[in-house]
């Protein structure tokens, strides 16, 4: 039986403020020792994820921009993959809408409403760095978006409802992460997780899926797996928008909770 772990990054595997994953090192080492695939499933861009792939030597498929696409290293699976095309060293399954169209819709909404909406595409790397706390190099990578626009909406609840209405009217969708709203196409983390899980099932037959997240944009992913975990927010609370009967609440904020969840589930089970 093959166990697979899907994980959010910001606020989950990596700390919300420091972007460090040091607190999760014991669990990361355990997964490597047991050869359990760790699949990044996040709002981050492909360019950002490649940094973590190299740093953690985690050469598995990954899911970028809230399920915008699955990037599978060439020759990773022995089975034939369907509905894929090649980009660089990857076989890619796309679910998302082009960034150009998404930006156009967001700009139209801003013009129609006059609301203060600021997306990554409105900022230079220095602006993204200041807003996120990322260093300049990381901020540049965060701007290389393909399927999703992260934005801030500095308005009241009525304005938020209006923006959501206009996003839907344009045939697009939205979600909310730890820091930003996201406008995107007909994709979410859950669709990508289910598609990638099916590929693993074709390869290994029996598969058990695990996922860890912290925010609303993780809910589709958490619904799509066998064992879902929710880690605590920086204030020590769990996101109240995550309503799922089978959810397991990891004790600890971000990577501390992530580490505890994996060590409890994997470290104490000799059969895994």
Swiss-Prot record:
Activity at various pH: Optimum pH is between 5.5 and 6.5 with GPG and MPG as substrates.
EC number: 3.1.3.70, 3.1.3.85
Catalysis performed (reactions): (2R)-2-O-(alpha-D-glucopyranosyl)-3-phospho-glycerate + H2O = (2R)-2-O-(alpha-D-glucopyranosyl)-glycerate + phosphate; 2-O-(alpha-D-mannosyl)-3-phosphoglycerate + H2O = (2R)-2-O-(alpha-D-mannosyl)-glycerate + phosphate
Thermoactivity: Optimum temperature is 50 degrees Celsius with GPG and 60 degrees Celsius with MPG. With GPG as substrate, the activity becomes undetectable below 20 degrees Celsius and above 70 degrees Celsius, and with MPG as substrate, the activity is almost undetectable at 30 degrees Celsius. At 50 degrees Celsius, divalent cations are absolutely required for GpgP activity with GPG and MPG as the substrates.
Binding site for Mg(2+): 8, 10, 214
SUPFAM superfamilies tied to this protein: HAD-like
An example molecular function term from Gene Ontology annotations: nickel cation binding
GO CC annotations on file: cytosol
First-tier enzyme category under EC: hydrolase
Gene Ontology biological process terms in this record: mannosylglycerate biosynthetic process
Residues of the active site: 8
Record keywords, A-Z: Hydrolase, Magnesium, Metal-binding
Function, in words: Involved in the biosynthesis of glucosylglycerate. Catalyzes the dephosphorylation of glucosyl-3-phosphoglycerate (GPG) and mannosyl-3-phosphoglycerate (MPG) to glucosylglycerate (GG) and mannosylglycerate (MG), respectively.
Self-association and partners: Monomer.
Entry protein name: Glucosyl-3-phosphoglycerate/mannosyl-3-phosphoglycerate phosphatase
Species assigned in the record: Methanococcoides burtonii (strain DSM 6242 / NBRC 107633 / OCM 468 / ACE-M)
């Amino acid at each position: 039986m093959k166990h697979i772990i899907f994980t959010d990054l910001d606020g989950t595997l990596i700390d919300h403020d420091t972007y460090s994953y040091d607190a999760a090192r014991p669990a990361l080492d355990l997964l490597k020792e047991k050869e359990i695939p760790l699949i990044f499933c996040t709002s981050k861009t492909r360019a950002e994820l490649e940094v973590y792939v190299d740093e953690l030597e985690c050469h598995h498929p990954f899911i970028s921009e809230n399920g915008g696409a699955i990037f599978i290293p060439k020759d990773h699976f022995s089975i034939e993959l369907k509905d894929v095309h090649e980009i660089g060293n990857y076989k890619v399954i796309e679910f998302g809408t082009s960034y150009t169209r998404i930006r156009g819709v967001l700009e139209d909404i801003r013009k129609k409403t006059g609301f203060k909406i600021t997306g990554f595409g409105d900022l230079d790397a220095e602006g993204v760095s200041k807003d996120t706390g990322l260093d300049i190099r990381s901020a540049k990578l965060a701007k290389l978006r393909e399927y999703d626009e992260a934005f801030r909406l500095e308005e009241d609840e009525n304005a938020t409802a209006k923006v959501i209405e206009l996003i839907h009217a344009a045939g697009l969708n939205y979600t909310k992460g730890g820091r930003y709203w996201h406008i995107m196409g007909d994709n979410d983390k859950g669709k990508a997780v289910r598609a990638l899980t099916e590929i693993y099932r074709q390869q290994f037959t029996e598969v058990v899926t695990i996922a860890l997240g912290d925010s609303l944009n993780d809910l589709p992913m958490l619904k799509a797996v066998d064992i879902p975990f929710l880690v605590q927010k920086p204030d020590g609370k769990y996101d109240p928008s995550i309503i799922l009967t089978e959810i397991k609440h990891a004790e600890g904020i971000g990577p501390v909770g992530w580490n505890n969840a994996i060590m409890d589930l994997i470290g104490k089970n000799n059969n895994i």
